[in-house]
UniProtKB/Swiss-Prot annotation:
This is ATP synthase subunit b 2. It holds the Pfam family ATP-synt_B. F(1)F(0) ATP synthase produces ATP from ADP in the presence of a proton or sodium gradient. F-type ATPases consist of two structural domains, F(1) containing the extramembraneous catalytic core and F(0) containing the membrane proton channel, linked together by a central stalk and a peripheral stalk. During catalysis, ATP synthesis in the catalytic domain of F(1) is coupled via a rotary mechanism of the central stalk subunits to proton translocation. The chain crosses the membrane at residues 33-55. InterPro entries: ATP_synth_b/b'su_bac/chlpt, ATP_synthase_B_chain. Its main location: membrane.
C-alpha cells in the first residue's frame, strides 16, 4: 500500500511537469503573454457571437414576452371594464325592475282597496235594503198580529167575563176595554 501511494505521488508530479521538467504550461511565466492574448481573443469572439447572435434572439424573446404580457394586461383591463359596465347595467335594470314591482304592487293595492270598498258598499246597500224589507215585513206582521190579538183578546175577555159573571158582556164594551189595554191606558 505504501508502494501504491508512492506511485500515485510520482504520477501526480508527472502530470504537473512537462517532459523537460518545466511544469504545467498554464503556470509557466514565459507563456503568460500568449495565454492572455488567446484569452482576450476568445472573450472578444465570444462577445461578438453573443452580442450578434444570442442577445438579439434573447431580446426578441423578451420583447415578444413583454408584448404578450402587455396584450394580456390590455385584454384583462378591457374585460374588467366590460364586466363593470355589465354589472352597472345589471344593477340599473335591477333597480328599475324593483321600482316597477313596487309601482305594480301599489297599483294592485289601490285596485284591491277600491274593489273591496265597492264590494263593501254594495254589501252594505244590500243589507240595508234587506233590513228595510225585513222591518217592513215585521211591521206588517205586527199589524196583522195586533189586529188578530185584538180580536182574540176581545173574545177571551168576553169569555172570562161570562165565566165570572155568568152573563155575556156587550161587544162594544169589551172592544173598548181591549183597545184601552192595548194602547196602555187601562
Amino acid at each position: 500500500m505504501a508502494e501504491s501511494h508512492g506511485e500515485a505521488k510520482g504520477t501526480a508530479s508527472a502530470h504537473t511537469e512537462a517532459e523537460g521538467g518545466h511544469g504545467f504550461p498554464p503556470f509557466q511565466k514565459e507563456t503568460f503573454p500568449s495565454q492572455i492574448v488567446s484569452l482576450v481573443i476568445t472573450f472578444v469572439a465570444l462577445y461578438v457571437i453573443v452580442s450578434r447572435l444570442a442577445l438579439p434572439k434573447v431580446g426578441g424573446v423578451i420583447d415578444a414576452r413583454q408584448k404578450a404580457i402587455d396584450g394580456d394586461l390590455a385584454e384583462a383591463q378591457r374585460l374588467n371594464d366590460e364586466s363593470e359596465a355589465a354589472m352597472k347595467a345589471y344593477e340599473s335594470e335591477l333597480a328599475a325592475a324593483r321600482a316597477r314591482a313596487q309601482a305594480i304592487g301599489a297599483e294592485t293595492r289601490e285596485k284591491l282597496a277600491a274593489s273591496s270598498d265597492a264590494e263593501r258598499k254594495a254589501l252594505e246597500d244590500s243589507l240595508a235594503a234587506k233590513l228595510a224589507a225585513a222591518e217592513k215585513s215585521i211591521a206588517t206582521t205586527r199589524a196583522t198580529a195586533m189586529s188578530n190579538v185584538r180580536g182574540i183578546a176581545a173574545d177571551a175577555a168576553s169569555a172570562i167575563v161570562q165565566q165570572l159573571t155568568g152573563k155575556a158582556p156587550a161587544g162594544k164594551t169589551v172592544e173598548a176595554a181591549v183597545d184601552a189595554s192595548l194602547k196602555g191606558t187601562a
